[in-house]
Amino acid sequence: MPQTQTAPTELGSESIGILLKKYAVPGIIAMTASSLYNMVDSIYIGHIPGSGSLAISGLAVTFPLMNLSTALGTLVGVGAATMISVLLGQRNYKIANKVLANEVTLNCIVGLLFTVFCLMFLDPILYFFGASANTLKYARDYMEIILYGNVITHLYFGLNSIIRSSGNPKMAMGLTLFTVILNSILDPI
């Protein structure tokens, strides 16, 4: 049965300048926009009446843990994206699809293990990252919400890398912008 999929061919034929604009500009916009996640969270949390400063301190304590989670999801995704890019260049779509399936499975497993481990040891982890008796409640409340959606976060960061490396940097940027807007809308709820 012949393959009907096509791989982006501009990587082998377009000039470096054009490719740089096509891939780097959406990447820069997406990375800049993704920094808004924590800024928007900080704005809403900082305005909590009576406890804004403690809540902001609790939020700041969670950043290293959230960065570690993001790094693990991205690690799996970038590794798979690299393999998929090579396979698409070779027009080996069957193996590329297997790598994609393995990436999804591995990111689900890693995300779930990370979530379970963190929920089991959340207080000691937060103390390790600088929580105090005054900020622990806020850090725990925020991090528990983040951890319950952690598998989705792992999948998002992993699949976003694959989308970008498969020749769709604008789609990857659009997904990032969508999640930033969604986060901004859902934060007050």
Regions found by a protein language model. Give the residues of each.
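Small-residue-rich hydrophobic transmembrane alpha-helices
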Residues: 56-116, 153-172
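Hydrophobic/aromatic residues within transmembrane alpha-helices of membrane transport systems
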Residues: 29, 41-45, 59, 84, ...
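Residue-level signal for short hydrophobic patches within transmembrane helices
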Residues: 17-36, 40, 65-72, 148, ...
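Residue-level recognition of transmembrane alpha-helices
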Residues: 24, 31, 60-63, 107, ...
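Interfacial/gating helices of multi-pass transporter permease domains
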Residues: 45-67, 134-138
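Short alpha-helical transmembrane segments in multi-pass integral membrane proteins
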Residues: 1-24, 84-151, 189
